[in-house]
């Protein structure tokens, strides 16, 4: 097979936080088994051996959750041992970790640095904004622990970026959020839409990100980002980077920006494999990585069905002048009713207004970075 990328949940849906907007919590509540616990050593070895045997060129192991650090540092030390043991083809291996940061200490930071992990740190901005939705299981604030994790990453020279969930409150205070990240010298930022639970009415929660709020957020964030670009202080914002890739190359490296789905090979802690992080549901279970090859998993009828469903272009999109840039957006924002055709993207109007507002300046940036 070509290079392989896996998204792995070593602690299943387990987490030491109780974020109000957690999409994976709502997903796992709708499975026969809410949590599969910590990944066993035999599952880990089967997975590593499988990928290193079948991939060509390089492969990527991305650990997410739940909270992956709940698996323990020993789990990841075992991972490195197994990668060395089974990498007889001398593949280039990329490891990454998405964490809430609350369990990061000196030992973790040192390990991540020494083993060249790329780390995503979940942080929603300054204290009052972050703590609003990101409490621990006891209802306590988490900001100070996350800020401490960022300091440790800098101390040990861990390569990391910030993942910020955009809620209604974030959208209203984008100036505070961007200013805080800038003060902390965070140069790599990813802002992701807060998702209401799958197949529930959209916009009914206090945290829900409504289209009008998202429009304002995108415009204001772009203004700050563009001003910094003109002043020689370029900040990487994944969504804007994805748009620039689309302008310059015709497609983006970011999932959700190309209009159609691919198979992400999401691996739950019991070895079960799913096509997408947003659809880790019994309905879309492809099989188990312990007893099926990656090719067999990819060729399952369920995977083909999942991908095929994303190919239908909405009639409104076909006549939209921004379709080549937007491509309909992420399937998750088009999926409103179970077992129904995908609809127009929930944020369609937001994107239209944003593109009208920012496109000339996006072209200017693209021309300057060719």
Swiss-Prot record:
Function: Involved in 'Cys-type' sulfatase maturation under anaerobic conditions. Catalyzes the post-translational modification of cysteine ('Cys-51' in the arylsulfatase CPF_0221) into 3-oxoalanine (also known as C(alpha)-formylglycine (FGly)), by a free radical chemical mechanism initiated via the reductive cleavage of S-adenosyl-L-methionine (SAM). Is also able to oxidize a serine residue in a synthetic substrate to FGly in vitro, and in a serine variant of a Cys-type sulfatase in vivo, but this activity is not physiological.
Identification of the protein by name: Cysteine-type anaerobic sulfatase-maturating enzyme
Record's catalysed reaction(s): L-cysteinyl-[sulfatase] + S-adenosyl-L-methionine + H2O = 3-oxo-L-alanyl-[sulfatase] + hydrogen sulfide + 5'-deoxyadenosine + L-methionine + 2 H(+)
Tree of life domain: Bacteria
Entry's cofactor comment: Binds 3 [4Fe-4S] clusters. The first cluster is coordinated with 3 cysteines and an exchangeable S-adenosyl-L-methionine. The two auxiliary clusters may create a conduit for electrons to travel from the buried substrate to the protein surface.
Gene3D superfamilies, sorted: Aldolase class I (3.20.20.70)
GO molecular function terms attached to this record: 4 iron, 4 sulfur cluster binding; metal ion binding; oxidoreductase activity
Species the sequence originates in: Clostridium perfringens (strain ATCC 13124 / DSM 756 / JCM 1290 / NCIMB 6125 / NCTC 8237 / Type A)
């Amino acid at each position: 097979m070509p290079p392989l990328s896996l998204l792995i949940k070593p602690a299943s849906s387990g987490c030491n936080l109780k974020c109000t907007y957690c999409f994976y919590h709502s997903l796992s509540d709708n499975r026969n088994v809410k949590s599969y616990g910590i990944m066993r050593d035999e599952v880990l070895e089967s997975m590593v051996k499988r990928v290193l045997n079948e991939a060509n060129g390089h492969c990527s192991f991305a650990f997410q959750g739940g909270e992956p650090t709940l698996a323990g540092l020993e789990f990841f030390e075992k991972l490195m041992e197994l990668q060395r043991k089974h990498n007889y083809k001398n593949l280039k291996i990329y490891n990454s970790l998405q964490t809430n940061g609350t369990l990061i200490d000196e030992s973790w930071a040192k390990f991540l640095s020494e083993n060249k992990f790329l780390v995503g740190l979940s942080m929603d901005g300054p204290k009052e904004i972050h703590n609003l939705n990101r409490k621990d299981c006891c209802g306590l604030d988490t900001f100070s622990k996350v800020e401490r994790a960022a300091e440790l990453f800098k101390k040990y020279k861990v390569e990391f970026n910030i993942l910020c969930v955009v809620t209604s409150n974030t959208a209203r205070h984008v100036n505070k959020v961007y200013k805080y990240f800038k003060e902390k010298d965070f140069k790599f930022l990813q802002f992701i839409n807060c998702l209401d639970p799958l197949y529930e009415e959209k916009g009914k929660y206090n945290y829900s990100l409504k289209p009008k709020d998202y429009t304002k957020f995108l415009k204001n964030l772009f203004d700050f980002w563009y001003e910094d670009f003109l002043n020689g202080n370029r900040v990487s914002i994944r969504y804007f980077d994805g748009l620039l890739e689309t302008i310059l190359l015709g497609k983006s490296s970011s999932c959700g920006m190309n209009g159609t789905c691919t198979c992400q090979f999401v691996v739950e802690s019991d070895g079960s494999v799913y096509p997408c992080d947003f659809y880790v549901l019994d309905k879309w279970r492809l099989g188990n990585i312990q007893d099926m090859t990656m090719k067999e998993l990819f060729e399952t009828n369920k995977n083909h069905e999942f991908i095929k469903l994303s190919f239908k272009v909405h009639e409104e999109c076909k006549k939209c002048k921004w379709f080549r840039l937007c491509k309909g957006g992420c399937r998750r924002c088009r999926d409103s009713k179970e077992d129904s055709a995908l609809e127009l993207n929930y944020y369609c109007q937001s994107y239209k207004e944003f593109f009208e507002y920012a496109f000339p300046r996006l072209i200017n940036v693209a021309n300057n970075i060719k």
